[in-house]
């Protein structure tokens, strides 16, 4: 089977027991562990560490959806039969028994520099940004959107279609049924905001005065500060502020 690799890139190290179906495109320098199954259409970037017993690209959990034998058969090219696949960026760490389902109307997407711990799950059509941490046994329902730099604690469950804002910290065992605000600390069942993620803001390089200026916006009681934010953070929070209030 063909597993495309960019010309001149570092070699991929794939355990002989791993199963990669047709339509799986790899960048370079990836490690893929024992008994992992990846079925196309899937596109994976560079320098990812994918541990043992990981599944990527299997069909979304839809009773009426197709369940092709994609580890044996090549994709047909028809999304109605193949699904819309998975796109994974670079430098992610995907630990044992994690899973990513393919999309049903768009590709399920994982960004760069994320850490998916043991048993975490990304449902169909989900979008996960960059530098996201999903602790052990975090479950993301279909169509969820986790923005960059969010950190979801062990055993958190996110309902289908819910959104987690950038830099949010969700405490372990939480049940998220609706939107979680940017840079909030949220915990419980049902999950509710309990404070501001000061640690997350300080790790983004903000001094105390800038954190204080941003806090009313985080709490939903003020506007974004006009200046004082690093360019990358400013771009991120402005995008969150301008997000559509409803998603698919």
Question: What does each model-found stretch correspond to?
Answer:
Residues 1-11, 246-248:
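Short, low-complexity, intrinsically disordered N-terminal peptides in bacterial proteins
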Residues 7-192:
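Structural signal for interior beta-strand "rungs" in well-ordered beta-sheet cores
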Residues 184-206:
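Conserved beta-strand-loop-alpha-helix hinge in the C-terminal portion
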Residues 218-221:
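Interhelical loop and adjacent transmembrane-helix boundary motif
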Residues 227-248:
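Short, amphipathic C-terminal "tail helix"
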């Amino acid at each position: 089977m063909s597993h495309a690799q960019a010309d001149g890139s570092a070699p991929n190290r794939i355990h002989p027991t791993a199963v990669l179906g047709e339509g799986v495109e790899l960048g370079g320098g990836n490690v893929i562990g024992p008994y992992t199954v990846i079925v196309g259409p899937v596109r994976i970037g560079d320098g990812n560490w994918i541990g043992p017993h990981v599944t990527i690209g299997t069909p979304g959990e839809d009773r009426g959806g197709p369940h092709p034998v994609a580890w044996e058969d090549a994709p047909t090219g028809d999304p109605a039969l193949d699904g819309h696949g998975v796109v994974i960026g670079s430098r992610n760490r995907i630990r044992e028994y994690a899973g990513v389902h393919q999309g049903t109307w768009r590709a399920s997407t994982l960004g760069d520099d994320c850490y998916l711990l043991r048993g975490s799950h990304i449902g169909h059509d989900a979008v996960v940004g960059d530098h996201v941490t999903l602790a052990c046994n975090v479950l993301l329902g279909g169509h969820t959107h986790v923005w960059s730099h969010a950190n979801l604690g062990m055993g958190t469950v996110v309902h289908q279609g819910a959104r987690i804002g950038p830099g949010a910290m969700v405490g372990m065992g939480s049940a998220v049924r609706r939107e979680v605000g940017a840079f909030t600390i949220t915990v419980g069942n049902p999950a509710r905001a309990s404070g501001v993620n000061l640690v997350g803001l300080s790790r983004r390089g903000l001094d105390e005065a800038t954190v204080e200026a941003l806090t009313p916006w985080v709490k939903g009681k003020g506007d974004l500060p006009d200046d004082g934010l690093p360019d990358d953070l400013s771009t991120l929070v402005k995008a969150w502020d301008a997000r559509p209030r409803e998603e698919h």
